[in-house]
Amino acid sequence: TDDDLERVRAEVTALRRARRTARLAARLADAIEPTFFVRGMRGLDPEGVIRTLGARLIAAGAVDASYVDGAVERERMSSTAFSDHLAVPHAMTMSARRTAIAIAIDQTAIDWAGTPVHVVALIAFADSGRAEFQEVFDQFVEAFSERDNVLRLVRGATDYTGLVSELARLMEAAG
């Protein structure tokens, strides 16, 4: 019947969405290690947040100190706040040893060059794998274009598992 056909279509759509979300979560987990997640950044200015996140990337061998210095310098040239809630600092070069994302989240916004920011994602781009990661990055930024998405992430990402699963859901819906 038509109702049966519609139920099957809905199930197939739900299954495809679940698979896409799982693939996206796996890609995010590759780029965001548990130690790359910081809950809270109060009292820090943009440079302090970049250096805090950068130290975690350095400790994991994803970048060296010059990459973090480059991200700080890039931020001084022009704010990397993408929206009223997200900043995405990064260096001008793709000199990271591997592509990685370190994320800080705080329920209280910090002042990011005049923009209130709840989420900071320090992106480390490696030359290898850049094209593959570009899709993930585009969806990441798109997911944060909606204020409600940012607030949902801020509430839901209380630990690493919550961060990755919430990000994957938001990005899947955005992409």
Where are the model-predicted features located?
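Cytosolic covalent-transfer regions centered on His/Cys nucleophiles
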Residues: 1-175
